[in-house]
Amino acid sequence: MGQAALNILPVTAQLLVEGGDKRIKLDPLRGVNRYGCGPTPDPNLLDYSSATASVISTTAFAAANRLRERLEQDMRYLTPDAIYERELARMRRELLALCELGDLPEPDIVFAASGTDLHRIAAQLTQAATDRPALVLMVDETETGSGIRAAITETSPGIQVAAVALRKADGLPRSAAEIDAHFTELALQAHAAGRHVLLIQADISKTGMIAPSYGCTAALQQALDSQLDVLVDACQFRIAPATLRACLARGYSVALTGSKFVGGPSFSSALIIPAGTAGQFRQRPFPRKLANFSAAADWPDCWPVREVLERSWNFGLLLRWDAALSELRAFRSLHDVDVTRFLQTFARAMQARLSGNPAYSVVAVPGLDRSALLEKPGWDQVQTIFPFQLYRATDSGRQVLNAEQTLQVYRDLPTAALHCQLGQPVNYSAERNALRLCLSARLVVQAVANDGKDANRIITQALTVLDQAARLANLT
């Protein structure tokens, strides 16, 4: 965050990697961040990595560059903190419109650099809103952000964190009933011990799962009433507006990022808090520990933050969110029926290739069930993250790649002759990591626009990326 007005802003590529943490700092030798993404467009990259991060598109970079130019002009007569506040207010309005939330009492939107910071903020708000000690109940870290648990406990040592595994030791998913029972047991135990519970509902996890079920979350909300807060971890942003509205209508806060499915640059996050829940939080003293992670303008002006948070600014966050909104705008222009049709066609093609070729095995993902929220399913019922295990050919058949070998394939993909990228490996069972082929909103726009003329190209490219991963597996 800036601390003094500048006469000239850094160039767009530099601003895009400022105002985050070490994860988006560029490797001086390779020119990419920890997620393998540089700060400028790479039109030749076959990018199917959106569960982790995406390289910025030409369109999104142009949007960020236009904003940078406007910021620089405005700094001649406005202070940076005033500009920052104005731009975030604009982005709140556009995000509300793009998420089609106009039929609800207006929720509050809090901006932050990362999804990790959103979880930190939610935990702090929960702790501040109750006189009881708090328990955060979440899915195991193999299926969510690796630093979330540490971030919560470091910021709030008095908060306990409990986690539920979504997969068995062999990598197969636990049944929904088993997962729900585990969440319920831990929540009821905490409640009986006098704790307030923050339940983090994963939608979608690293391998594409929803947990606990929304039915379980609703039952816990009824049982624990005011002693339960719910945060929907939708940081992948693989949810339709109807799903988001349904969550907010039930009083659930929702964490989103612009850098996963939407395809914007890494480190652009937003916490959407329903009006009723926000009103309850605002009645309590604002958590002073958030001064290290928030600026005053990150919060709507109805929050009592001015005595706690600095009037600082983060122009890198502005550019990253503006880039993400340009991608979301294009995606929201599509008809849901066309999106659903393409997603289903794509999913069938990926499942056929992954299950019908000895170079891969499918990492099972249960169906996406949001029936407790909505009677009519939307496009977000269709799988868009495809985790798979790689094998290399041997004289006797095939041999599974271990975690180190899988990581090497992941690292080699962007630098190979065929320039491509997959989602980071996920440890889904003992000694085994899955790569993830992922659809992004940008790819869906390319496939569906122009009457779907490019749909086959997007599918063929994805199959080509899988073929390249198989070739590299045989070289490890």
What residue spans do the PLM features occupy?
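Low-complexity, highly charged intrinsically disordered N-terminal segments
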Residues: 43-89, 159-195
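Conserved PLP-enzyme active-site core in the AAT-like
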Residues: 110-113, 119-308, 314
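Active-site C-terminal subdomain of aminotransferase-like
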Residues: 259-379, 466-469
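Conserved PLP-binding catalytic core of the aspartate aminotransferase-like
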Residues: 361-416
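PLP-dependent enzyme catalytic core of the Aspartate aminotransferase-like
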Residues: 426-476
